[in-house]
């Protein structure tokens, strides 16, 4: 059984003991799907005799996999999240469920999936910037449901996202790159696309320059 901010596992077939561990301060475990993964790992760790402190320490040291809800930069209460591996709407739904006050960068080469699958999560989104081959179509599909602009490139979307946060005076927000599309319109693969986005942490001067305008 999974509860908010806690992992609680009932191992019915093995023991009557209810295992419980506090994960509220483990910020690298983002999203319910990662809590579920952690729950499975926790069961195995307890069965081989590891203590809660040892398990929690391992969770806290785990940085996650690249391009999967990867925190690449944090500026105060503004986070920059690389989810380039989310190449379909189903993967992106997990990202949207994991955050609030989202500036969402979306688009690439469409897999002909229905974007309306993501409509239930738009209340978490402040603004959408669409990019790539499918960008114009996505912007039209989202028009009237959320603030949205087609900006073509990932670089433009990044700059527009920073400007939007500044103009809107958002104190806490997430710039989420979760494209829900493949990368093949502009990049070799999702890894190359993710690495391009990850240049954010190497371009702090650009961020400060934009903020100073």
Regions found by a protein language model. Give the residues of each.
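Glycine/aspartate-rich loop-and-adjacent alpha/beta segment that forms the canonical ThDP
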Residues: 180-207
């Amino acid at each position: 059984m999974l509860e908010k901010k806690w992992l609680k596992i009932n191992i019915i077939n093995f023991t009557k003991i209810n295992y419980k561990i506090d994960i509220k301060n483990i910020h690298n475990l983002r999203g319910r799907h990662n809590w579920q993964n952690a729950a499975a790992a926790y069961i195995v760790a307890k069965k081989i005799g590891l203590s809660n402190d040892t398990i929690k320490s391992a969770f806290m040291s785990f940085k996650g996999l690249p391009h999967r809800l990867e925190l690449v930069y944090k500026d105060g209460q503004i986070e920059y999240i690389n989810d380039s591996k989310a190449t379909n709407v189903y993967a992106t739904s997990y990202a949207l469920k994991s955050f609030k006050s989202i500036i969402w960068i979306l688009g690439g080469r469409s897999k002909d999936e229905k974007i309306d699958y993501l409509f239930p999560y738009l209340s978490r989104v402040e603004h959408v910037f669409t990019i790539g081959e499918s960008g114009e179509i996505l912007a039209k599909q989202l028009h009237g449901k959320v603030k949205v602009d087609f900006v073509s490139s990932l670089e433009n979307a990044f700059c527009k996202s920073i400007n939007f946060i500044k103009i809107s005076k958002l104190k806490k927000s997430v710039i989420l790159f979760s494209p829900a599309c493949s990368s093949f319109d502009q990049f070799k693969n999702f890894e190359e696309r993710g690495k391009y986005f990850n240049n954010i942490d190497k371009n702090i001067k650009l961020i400060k320059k934009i903020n100073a305008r």
